Amino acid sequence: ERFDVSSKVGYVFKDMPYQSIGFQNAFNSHNQKSYFGLNQYNIKQSSFYSNLIFNSIISNTMHKFATGLNFTYDKYQEFVNVNDYSRIDNSVGAFFEYTYDNDSNFSLVAGGRVDNHNRLGTFITPRLHIRYNPWEKGVLRVSAGRGKRSANIFAENQPLFASARTFEILDTNGKIYGLDPEIAWNYGLSFNQKFTIFERSA
């Protein structure tokens, strides 16, 4: 059983097509009752998401930025056999992203966000993307960023309920399911060169 509803409104400022403001909202409800042999898994989730974003430029269109606020709310009524893992999660966040593009051979996107979560506290997630064309048909890309999330360990691994395995959570000092959140630092570097062999692109 699932229900979804969403809304999106925006406004582009008169005589300033590069400047706009948008407001997004979404609500969904999901109710699932499952039996895997002798294992029973029931979950009812209600989620709300709201996002306010403002886009504009700095001096000229080579320098753009986006900033805003968002709010998320998740209520879980989750039962694994006789164990109750129900909880309520909510967070408030603010973000800022700057984009530079010289419309020729270089672009940069740098941003970050600050979130305050009722269980995970306050944390920062930055990110950076760079694209450079040193010569014709050659592209160098560099990226880096940080991510943090709390996994829904049962909902994301439901096929395991069909096995004969038992479930034990060994750590109990974390904030969600007794576990700490997943934290990942991601880095990327690539170079792509297009050329022609025997009049064919390669």
Roles of regions detected by a PLM:
Residues E1-D4, K8, N133, K137-V139, ...:
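Outer-membrane beta-barrel signature, preferentially recognizing the C-terminal barrel domain
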Residues R2-L120, W135, R200-S201:
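Face-selective signature of the C-terminal outer-membrane beta-barrel domain
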